Amino acid sequence: NSFIICAVCRGDDVFIPNGDFIIIPGDILHITGSHHDLGKIVKELISKKSTNVKSIMLIGGSRISIYLTNMLTASGKDVVVIEKNKRNCDKLYEHCPKATVINGDASDYSLLAEEGIDKVDAVVTLTDTDEVNFLVSMYSESIGVKKNITKINNQNLSRMLTKMGMESYV
């Protein structure tokens, strides 16, 4: 049950935190940990701000998605996972029997609409493609989804998210 904060971005400055470093609101944290522990962090981000989150749409079927889906369904949440790769969908079907798994492309607006993105309480984008994560998160925010958590690897995109007012990304 651990993770490491590797770097902290504050404005245009980057810090490698030590034991005395103090994190302040607005800092961008770069963390590393096991898939299981990162899943726990995302679950905490979902439940921290919105205690009434009951339905979640996950975009992407990675190992983190499997851990997160199982944690969320075990706590009584309704979870829909959209994954493009059929093989990954098969793993999700096998390991996450309480979730609804959809084999499809999340960049397809009609699929998101068909699967009820406008009715969920939270959207978590966990694909390997920053641009898909970014666009789906921006779209879900624009239609009123209460909580959006976005996986972003590219530092420039994470700065953009901050400037656009998105609070939660990993």
Sequence positions of predicted segments:
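Cytosolic regulatory regions of ion transport systems
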Residues: 1-170
